[in-house]
C-alpha cells in the first residue's frame, strides 16, 4: 500500500489557485512542482488535468503518490520549467488553461543539508536543483575575484560584494571552500551581523544559488513560454520571493499588458494589442496568519494575468547582460 503523501501547504496557495479559477476539463501546468501543493489544490477544485514540471528528481519521485491518488489526472515531468512549451506539446497539450509558478528554492531543498542550499546547515557547497552542472563550490573555486563580486552584487544585491569576493579568493588560496559552513564563516567575517537583520551570508548564498541554477534566465524563458501556450482566457499566476524575481515578473506583465513599442532594452518589440490583461495591479501578499505559520511567506508576492487573443510577442525571452554560468566557468 502506498503511503499517504505529506500535505504541503504552498505559499499563497489559496490565492494563486483562485487566480487560476480551475474549471472541469481544463489542463493546468504546475511549472515548479516541488512538494506538489499547488497541484493538489488545483486537482481538488475541479475535474482537471495537471502537468507538473520540476528539474529536481527528488521532487518528481516524491510526487508519485499524488499521481496515484489523482487517478491519472496528474502527469509529472522531470525538466526545467523554461521548457514548459515543449513539455506540454509532448504531453498532447498544445494550449493550456492555466499555469502556476513558485519561483526559487523550495523548503524541501533548504531543509536538506546535503543539497548545500542553507548556511544554517553544514553540508557540501552544492546548491544545484537538478544535480547536473557546476556546483556552487566549483564557482567559488574557479571564478575570478571580479566575476565573484559581480555575481554576489547582481544576484544577491550585496553591497559589500567586492569585500566578500576578496575574502573568498584569499581563503581558497589556503584550502578549498567546499562546505556551506566554510563559506558562511568567510562571509560573516566581512559582513557584520546587526540585531534583527538577516544572516550576513544570506545574500551571498542567494546569489550563488541563483547563478548556479541560472534561475533568472529560467524565469524569463518560462514567462515567454507561458505566453505561447496559454489559450485566450488562460491565466498565469507567479509567486516570487525576492525583488529580482518580482521585478522580472512585474516588467513582463507590464510590457505584455500594453500596445506599441517595447521597453528601452527591447525597443524592436511591437504589439498591436496586449497579450495579457493584468489581474493584480498590486502584488498579493500573505496575511499575518500565513506568515506566522510559515515565515518564508513574509517576502512572497503573487502576480497574475489573463491571456488575451492577441498573438504572442515576437520575443525570445533574452536575458539582460548579467554574468553567464558558462562564461564564468570557462574563464570568459
From Swiss-Prot:
Positions annotated to bind S-adenosyl-L-methionine: 36-38, 54, 81, 102, 109
Lineage top rank: taxon: Bacteria
Region (Disordered): 284-332
Cytoplasm among keywords: yes
One annotated GO molecular function: rRNA (cytosine-N4-)-methyltransferase activity
InterPro entries tied to this protein: RsmH (IPR002903), SAM-dep_MeTrfase_MraW_recog (IPR023397), SAM-dependent_MTases_sf (IPR029063)
Protein name per the record: Ribosomal RNA small subunit methyltransferase H
GN (gene name): rsmH
